[in-house]
């Protein structure tokens, strides 16, 4: 199945493997992502006219808002970035400006394209690395040797390469030249400052500067892999493709958008810069040009998905212009006790499967009785009702509490099968959940 060519039905079927319920949210987002593919099949002139229908997801924390968008972007291999609206400040104030989310998207897009190109050249890179190490391990031939000696050397080199590829010489030490570690650049500063940073680095830190290091063959493989990748890859083409892909199929997920909404009830007491952040966000969502270190990017074809719990405010508390830029609205359901149980038993990589896999490393086989799983779901649901509702995240902490002693004393249980019963779950959690003063500690 072509990943970008997935139909809405296929997208929802994929999401069902990891996320229980939330049918309406899955359906809306599947259609929005499919429309990205449909648009790219049209004539260039018509493509420009069709802008994505941005989505506003409304639901409590832990119900699957981020996971739905992240999973689709991952399976379809689209540039994706998740940001939190509350982390941004109005232009003129100290803090991150909203344009940095677009720069983050472009960085992720370039990295995505680079990894794809590396995967295509994987065998070629591997061969070049092995050849370089083999030539280091095998002394070079002197000048003027006979053809027979040259053939013998070629055969020896081939055998050496085979041994390196099979890992036979991984522990042998060799001295190689590797590039000095590059200086990290802060990509969240404006492009003008980025260019100054890059120019200073070129002056004080020449790329060709190398240092000699003694490494094991295994370590040398990794060190040389990055260096040889850079020589084989077309950096400029990767940057251009990354920029283009971010522009045409990028996805920005803005979480906690309710935190920058100004409630009509408490408007005068709230941070006045919240509305300023909304107004700064507006041109980016509507469509504008943002300068990045890779070049300029137009934002009108980026898909924006905003999400928030809206406990203390309403979507209507956002400025009208911003509301209008998120025409599709989806309300996600709170998790019931039954859904909690299904999350533990029916998802492809459920929390239970994760803990079983982790403890199997120590030789401990963990089995959960069905009644124990139901009790976990029940107590997690009750904790959500009595304290702040954090959705499925509550399951992580309740299971962690139940398995805490077994995880700590894992070596004592090595080679054994441990069965988690309803009684064990109750003994670990019931007193904690029953006491409203203690329930807040089950995060």
Curated annotation (Swiss-Prot):
It is found in: Cytoplasm. Pfam families: AAA, AAA_2, ClpB_D2-small. One of its GO terms (molecular function) is peptidase activity. Its main location: cytoplasm. SMART domains: AAA, ClpB_D2-small. InterPro entries: AAA+_ATPase, ATP-dep_Clp_protease_ClpX, ATPase_AAA_core, Clp_ATPase_C, HslU, P-loop_NTPase. ATP binds at residues 20, 62-67, 255, 321, 393. Signal peptide: none annotated. GO terms for biological process: protein unfolding; proteolysis involved in protein catabolic process. ATPase subunit of a proteasome-like degradation complex; this subunit has chaperone activity. The binding of ATP and its subsequent hydrolysis by HslU are essential for unfolding of protein substrates subsequently hydrolyzed by HslV. HslU recognizes the N-terminal part of its protein substrates and unfolds these before they are guided to HslV for hydrolysis. Belongs to the ClpX chaperone family. HslU subfamily. A double ring-shaped homohexamer of HslV is capped on each side by a ring-shaped HslU homohexamer. The assembly of the HslU/HslV complex is dependent on binding of ATP. This is ATP-dependent protease ATPase subunit HslU. The lineage of its organism: Bacteria, Pseudomonadati, Campylobacterota, Epsilonproteobacteria, Campylobacterales.
């Amino acid at each position: 199945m072509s990943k970008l060519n997935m139909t809405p039905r296929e997208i929802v079927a994929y999401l069902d493997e990891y996320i229980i319920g939330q049918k309406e949210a899955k359906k809306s987002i599947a259609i929005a992502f499919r429309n990205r593919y449909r648009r790219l099949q049209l004539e260039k002139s018509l493509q420009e006219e069709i802008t994505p229908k941005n989505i506003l997801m409304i639901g409590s924390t832990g119900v699957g808002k981020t996971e739905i968008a992240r999973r689709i972007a991952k399976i379809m291999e689209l540039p994706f970035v998740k940001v939190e609206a509350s982390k941004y400040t109005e232009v003129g104030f100290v803090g991150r400006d909203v344009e940095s989310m677009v720069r983050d998207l472009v960085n992720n897009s370039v990295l995505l394209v680079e990894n794809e190109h590396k995967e295509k050249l994987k065998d070629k890179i591997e061969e070049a690395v092995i050849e370089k190490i083999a030539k280091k391990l095998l002394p070079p031939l002197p000048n003027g040797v006979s053809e027979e000696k040259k053939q013998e050397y070629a055969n020896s080199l081939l055998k050496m390469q085979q041994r390196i590829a099979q890992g036979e010489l991984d522990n042998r030490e060799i001295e190689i030249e590797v590039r000095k570690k590059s200086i990290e650049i802060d990509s969240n500063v404006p492009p003008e400052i980025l260019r100054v940073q890059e120019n200073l680095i070129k002056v004080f830190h020449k790329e060709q500067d190398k240092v000699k290091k003694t490494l094991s063959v295994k370590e040398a493989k990794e060190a040389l892999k990055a260096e040889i990748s850079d020589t084989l890859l077309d950096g400029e083409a990767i940057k251009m493709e990354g920029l283009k892909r971010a522009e045409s199929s990028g996805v920005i997920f803005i979480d906690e958008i309710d935190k920058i909404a100004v409630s009509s009830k408490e408007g005068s007491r709230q941070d006045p810069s919240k509305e300023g952040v909304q107004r700064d966000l507006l041109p980016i969502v509507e469509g504008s040009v943002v300068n990045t270190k890779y070049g300029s990017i137009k934002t009108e074809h980026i898909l924006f998905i905003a999400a928030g719990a809206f406990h203390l405010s309403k979507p209507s508390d956002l400025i009208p212009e911003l509301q209008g830029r998120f025409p599709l609205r989806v309300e996600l359901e709170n998790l019931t006790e039954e859904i909690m149980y299904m999350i533990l038993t029916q998802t492809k990589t459920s929390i239970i499967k994760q803990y079983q896999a982790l403890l199997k490393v120590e030789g401990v086989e963990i089995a959960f009785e069905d009644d124990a799983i139901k009790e976990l779901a029940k107590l997690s649901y009750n904790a959500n009702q009595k304290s702040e509702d954090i959705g499925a995240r509550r399951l992580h902490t309740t299971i962690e509490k139940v398995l805490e002693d077994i995880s700590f004393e894992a070596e004592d249980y090595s080679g054994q099968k441990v069965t988690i019963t309803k009684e064990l779950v109750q003994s670990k959690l019931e007193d904690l959940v029953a006491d409203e003063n203690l329930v807040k500690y089950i995060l």
